[in-house]
Amino acid sequence: MYEYKCKVLRVVDGDTVDVDIDLGFGVWLHKERVRIMGIDTPESRTSDKVEKVFGLAAKERLISLLGEDAILDTQVSKKGEHMKGKFGRILGNFRTLAGEHCADILISEGHAVEYTGGSKEDTQTQHLANRQRLIDEGTVVVPEGL
């Protein structure tokens, strides 16, 4: 496991973040896209208006957890390369400056479900349960008519 300080450029959605990564000694990787490993959040860029409400809530929660600075934990393959997902994004997990893993927080609060690959249909039941939980807690309000 490797640990890097990074500057958050943009939270794309609840499980994807654009960052500049500080490799140390003044060396930076700029504009890297990181996929948070082990979770799936509702999509924030979708034609499903209800899902979008929950996706934007997950995105906002991740923004509040990360702020401008975060710690990125990544794994390196046997070839010495950062692990990458199917869309070429670095796979890793972010920690807040207080040391908390963002993935764990998002799961515990109902903004994300555990996901280790495979069909996203397998996670639908848990996503729907999370939706109801977030509504019941008053964390997310779905506008009437959606």
Where do the protein language model's features map onto the residues?
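Small beta-barrel nucleic-acid-binding modules, primarily SNase/OB-fold domains
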Residues: 1-146
